[in-house]
Each structure stands twice: as structure tokens, then as C-alpha cells.
């Protein structure tokens, strides 16, 4: 059964709701709201790989986000990266 991945901006919204200590890491989350798919280009600049770079940047800077929701969402984001 093939399922369609959730839009990245939807995942970002769930992160915003769950990560209580987001604070200084917000800069790594904000770009995720621009994208639906991992293959999306930057909406303003049009460069390819923008969504992938944003997801990689977020994952690299989200080690302090813990818990079951964090684990599931990080797995989901890694799954998006592996699809491409």
C-alpha cells in the first residue's frame, strides 16, 4: 500500500505545536513552511534542492527536541529524504 507523504509544511506545523523549547531553533523550522514536497524548489529564488536542504538543516539542529512525537516526525522527515 503506497501512501502519499504529508506536505512538509504540515509536518512543520506539528513540530511547532509539540516542541515547547523551540526558541533559538525556530530559524531551522521556519523554512519548512515554504514546501510541500522534498523535491520543491525555493519559491522566491527557484533553486533546486531547497526543500531537501531545509529538512537536512532542521534535522541537524533538532537534537534537543525529544519525545515520541519528535521521534516519529524525525523518522518521517528522514523517510522523505530517502524517497528522493
Roles of regions detected by a PLM:
Residues 3-26:
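N-terminal acidic leader/helix
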Residues 38-64:
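Acidic, low-complexity, intrinsically disordered interaction modules
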Amino acid at each position: 500500500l503506497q501512501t502519499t507523504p504529508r506536505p512538509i509544511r504540515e509536518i512543520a506545523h506539528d513540530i511547532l505545536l509539540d516542541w515547547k523549547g523551540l526558541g533559538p531553533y525556530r530559524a531551522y523550522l521556519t523554512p519548512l513552511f515554504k514546501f510541500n514536497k522534498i523535491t520543491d524548489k525555493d519559491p522566491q529564488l527557484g533553486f533546486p534542492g531547497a526543500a531537501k536542504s531545509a529538512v537536512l538543516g532542521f534535522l541537524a539542529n533538532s537534537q534537543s527536541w525529544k519525545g515520541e512525537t519528535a521521534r516519529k516526525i524525525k523518522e518521517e522527515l528522514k523517510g522523505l529524504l530517502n524517497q528522493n
